[in-house]
Amino acid sequence: TYMFMHGGFWHLFFNMFCLWMFGSALERTIGSKKYLIFYFVAGLGAVLTHTLVEYFQMGAMASANSGILSTGQINLLRTPTLGASGAIYGIQIGYAMLYPNDVWTLIFPPISLKAKWFVLIFIVIELFTGVTGTMDGVAHFAHLGGMLFGFLLLLYWKKSGKLWRR
């Protein structure tokens, strides 16, 4: 259910805007059934990735600070995760895989690039912010997980010849 809850109006607005911008074209291309499967695989892959990264980070913290965890003073594994952003990032990479040369233009700053380059930039930014811990409160590895699972599913469908069959 985490994919249907959001942290506020702007979180919901930007996810729905991206869902409309990129998801509608993706759905028209692969069909509604595959699109629904794609959306949930990317979303569930996002939370799986986020949970695994958090688990391993917790393990590293436990080794460094074993006394903190044993006394129950901290419990990071109960950090809530919410939003459809992981699935949305999966949709963005799916769109970029099917339409790599489409041009995306940002409003601020006014930059135009091909979809494949925007997605690559998103990956680098999410990886950097996730590893360095900048922009706290954002599940960067969930975004990357959504992209990874979306990429792998679309790659599987392409290679198996199932992408274009509705």
Locate each region found by the language model.
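A detector for small-residue-rich transmembrane helices and their helix-helix packing motifs
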Residues: 1-166
